[in-house]
């Protein structure tokens, strides 16, 4: 289960992280300390569960939960806070549970089990309602994405249809996804992983957890800080290749 802990207090994050490591079933536990970092992670990664504090430095956890709820595939939310005054509002937002600080392992485990139960039930329903040829359907979906030459983008209550070949890069910053093309720029609230699926062919490569580029639109590559690269696109936009994506990037453009 992939989980994100959102709390502006490092000690609280560390304590909850430690307790979750005592419970089986967590393969990834990430952390965020503010709204901007949280939205960036949620738009670039898919999480099963978010532990969310109420009082964050820059915004209310309740307000953040309302934004999360509007996502196409929102993660489950467990509020983890020192205040009990927002419990009713939390459950109005379909929170799985509401746990109070100081944290106790037994209480955390009880809340986590509720999430596991919901995920299990959801998977069973998906299995029952799916066709027998699920694998072939997934293959067909991938093939459809590769065959589809255009991509619809919704912005300002209008839907723009753009050619995939014209897309130079897709990136996330401050919770906003930007699609750069050869002739203009679009902004949307769709998460980065949505475009990863839509642009799943050999032309588009991920160079950062928040950036996808079209390698056919690379103009130049230069050495950058900490043994990384900076990529300049034909549009003039510049993007940094993060160290974790360096090996794959070099292979994709023939430097390996």
From Swiss-Prot:
Q: What does this protein do?
A: Member of the two-component regulatory system LytR/LytS that probably regulates genes involved in cell wall metabolism.
Q: What is the lineage of its organism?
A: Bacteria, Bacillati, Bacillota, Bacilli, Bacillales
Q: How is it modified after translation?
A: Phosphorylated by LytS.
Q: Where in the cell is it found?
A: Cytoplasm
Native source species: Staphylococcus haemolyticus (strain JCSC1435)
Q: Name one GO cellular component term.
A: cytoplasm
Pfam families associated with the record? LytTR, Response_reg
**Sorted alphabetically, which InterPro entries does this protein's record hold?**
CheY-like_superfamily, LytR-like, LytTR_DNA-bd_dom, Sig_transdc_resp-reg_receiver
- Name the record gives this protein: Sensory transduction protein LytR
Per the record, the domain of life is: Bacteria
